[in-house]
């Protein structure tokens, strides 16, 4: 049923607006729906990899009450940070953007080149990996996806997603994808097809339930 999410008709327009804000020449890696403790792991692994300057990381914590906490974490590490809620334009020297706005998760995903879905590096069970697939973006996730296990396994089987063993592996996979536009495009096509082919789950469930509910009355 989680496949039946509504993608706004203007999602690409929203994404273009964010890309203009981020810088059209930047390669954008979105960390979506991250949970407590995951940002620190990802930042440490990302910085250790000494990434090229044109890679911009957009961090979107799962819970709004953690926005300030994550901003403080990044600042404490000396990271160049802009907050979505404050910035009219992101300087080219900025390494991280904190996605501290509400209702823009799909737009962040649509503006990404590569997406990592959080809640999966630590044993939280994962977050909704179908959202980035629905906007045609390559999706990555960690080892802990028990809340979305069937979707995660299906995404892997369809070539729409990649599973990382840990934060360092996630960074390595992301770097490979960011360096390979053709592979990103193919994964994005597969992700969109995967999401589209699984829509209609709610209608199918209702059709299955209807005669059974009628019999029970």
Located regions from the model:
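Nucleotide-activated sugar donor-binding and catalytic core shared by glycosyltransferases
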Residues: 1-217
């Amino acid at each position: 049923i989680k496949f039946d999410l509504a993608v706004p008709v203007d999602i690409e327009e929203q994404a273009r607006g964010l890309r203009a804000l981020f810088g059209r020449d930047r390669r954008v890696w979105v960390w979506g729906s991250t949970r407590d403790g995951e940002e620190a792991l990802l930042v440490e692994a990302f910085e250790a990899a000494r990434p090229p300057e044109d890679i911009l990381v957009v961090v979107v914590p799962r819970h709004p009450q953690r926005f300030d906490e994550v901003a403080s974490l990044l600042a404490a590490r000396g990271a160049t940070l802009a907050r979505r809620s404050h910035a009219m334009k992101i300087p080219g020297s900025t390494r991280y953007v904190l996605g501290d706005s509400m209702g823009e998760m799909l737009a962040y995903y649509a503006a990404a080149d590569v997406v990592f879905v959080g809640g999966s590096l630590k044993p939280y069970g994962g977050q909704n990996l179908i959202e980035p697939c629905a906007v045609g973006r390559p999706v990555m996730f960690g080892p802990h996806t028990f809340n979305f296990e069937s979707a995660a396994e299906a995404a892997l089987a369809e070539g729409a997603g990649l599973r990382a063993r840990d934060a360092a592996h996630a960074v390595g996979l992301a770097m490979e994808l960011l360096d390979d536009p053709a592979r990103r495009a193919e994964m994005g096509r597969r992700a969109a097809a995967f999401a589209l082919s699984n829509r209609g789950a709610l209608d199918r469930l209702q059709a299955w339930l209807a005669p059974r509910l009628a019999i029970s009355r």
